[in-house]
Amino acid sequence: MADGEDIQPLVCDNGTGMVKAGFAGDDAPRAVFPSIVGRPRHTGVMVGMGQKDAYVGDEAQSKRGILTLKYPIEHGIVSNWDDMEKIWHHTFYNELRVAPEEHPVLLTEAPLNPKANREKMTQIMFETFNTPAMYVAIQAVLSLYASGRTTGIVLDSGDGVSHTVPIYEGYALPHAILRLDLAGRDLTDYLMKILTERGYSFTTSAEREIVRDVKEKLAYIALDYEQEMETANTSSSVEKSYELPDGQVITIGGERFRCPEVLFQPSLVGMEAAGIHETTYNSIMKCDVDIRKDLYGNIVLSGGTTMFPGIADRMSKEITALAPSSMKIKVVAPPERKYSVWIGGSILASLSTFQQMWIAKAEYDESGPSIVHRKCF
C-alpha cells in the first residue's frame, strides 16, 4: 500500500434504502443518498436536452415522475450488479468527488452474504475502479465497534432486512445469526395500508415517500400495546396532525404506534416470523451458555428502523420476560445508531492496527477474488 499519510480511506455502507459514504476518520458520512437507479420510461423527444440513460440517488428521486425506479439491493443483498456499479460510480465521482484508484475502500456487507457476492464486490472494486486496496466488513460488527464494544448482540434493522448478530471478542458467530425479512419498507407499506382505513389513499411510489416521512416523524413504540390501543380509542391524546406537500392536513392517531408494533408482532402483516425481541432471544440461545450473560448485558440497537422512540424500553421489557429471572439485561440505543455501521467503518479503517488487514491490489492480482474469504472474516 502507498505509504502516504495523507491518503484517507473511503468508507461506503451500502444499505437497501440508503447509501452512506465518506472518509475514514470523519465522525459522520459526507454523502447519504437513496440506493436507487432510475431509467427513463420514455425516450426523450426534445433535442439537446442531454437526457441520461440512468439517474442515481436524489436526482432519480426528484425525477421519479418520468423514471422507472429500481433498488439494486434487496433485503440487504446486492441483486443487480450493473446498477450497483452505477451507484458506486456515483458515490466516488459525484458525491465524494474522489478518484477511487487513489484511496483504499472499506465496503460493508450484510451478515450471511453469499460468498459469490463478496467475490463480485472485490472484483468490481479492483477491476472496474482500480482501487489500491479494499476490505469487506460485516455491518453489525461495525455497529458494535461504534458503540465501543467488542462483545454483544446487535439488532440491526434497516430498510430491507433485520438481523440479530451475536459477536464475541470482535468475531460474529455465524451459526447464531438470525435474519428477519421485516424492516423499514414493510413498516412504511403497513402504514400506507392502515392510513387507507382512515380514508387517506396513498398508492404510488411518490406517495410512499410521503408516508415514510410520516413514519419517521410521528411513529413511536408503545410500552404496552393493549393499553395504548385503549388510550387511543378513548381519548385524542395520541393524535397528531401532518401537513402533506399539497397543503392538505391529515390526522394520525393510533396508527402512530400500530405501525412499528409490527416489529414485535409480525403476524399483524401476516408474517409467521418471530418478533425482533424473540429473534434476539433465539439468537442468544444459539450461543454457548458461557457467553450468554455478556450478550444479555450488551444488546445494541443499530440501523434506521431502530430509531423509533420507546424501542429500547419495550425491547428491555420483552427480553426480561423471556430471559432467566436473575439475568441482568441492558439494551443500548446509541443516539447516532442510524449511521453506526458507517461510523464503525470509519473507526476501523483509521486504526493503525488495521492497516495490515487491507487486501492490496497486488494480492488480488495474484490470488483472484477468492482472496476476500481469507482476508475478511
Swiss-Prot record:
InterPro entries: Actin (IPR004000), Actin/actin-like_CS (IPR020902), Actin_CS (IPR004001), ATPase_NBD (IPR043129). GO terms for cellular component: chloroplast envelope; chloroplast stroma; cytoskeleton; cytosol; mitochondrion; plasmodesma. Preferentially expressed in young and expanding tissues, floral organ primordia, developing seeds, and emerging inflorescence. Displays a very high expression level in mature pollen and pollen tubes. Little or no reproductive-gene expression is detected in vegetative organs, such as root, stems, leaves, sepals and petals. PROSITE patterns: ACTINS_1, ACTINS_2, ACTINS_ACT_LIKE. It catalyses: ATP + H2O = ADP + phosphate + H(+). Its main location: cytoplasm. Disulfide bonds: none annotated. It is an enzyme of class 3 (hydrolase). It holds the Pfam family Actin. SMART domains: ACTIN (SM00268). It is found in: Cytoplasm, Cytoskeleton. The keyword Metal-binding does not apply. Keywords: Acetylation, ATP-binding, Cytoplasm, Cytoskeleton, Hydrolase, Nucleotide-binding. GO terms for molecular function: ATP binding; hydrolase activity; structural constituent of cytoskeleton. The modification N-acetylalanine is found at residue 2. Transmembrane segments: none annotated. PANTHER family: ACTIN. Polymerization of globular actin (G-actin) leads to a structural filament (F-actin) in the form of a two-stranded helix. The binding of profilin to monomeric G-actin cause the sequestration of actin into profilactin complexes, and prevents the polymerization. Belongs to the actin family. Actins are highly conserved proteins that are involved in various types of cell motility and are ubiquitously expressed in all eukaryotic cells. Essential component of cell cytoskeleton; plays an important role in cytoplasmic streaming, cell shape determination, cell division, organelle movement and extension growth. This is considered as one of the reproductive actins. There are 8 actin genes in A.thaliana. This is Actin-11. The lineage of its organism: Eukaryota, Viridiplantae, Streptophyta, Embryophyta, Tracheophyta. The gene is ACT11.
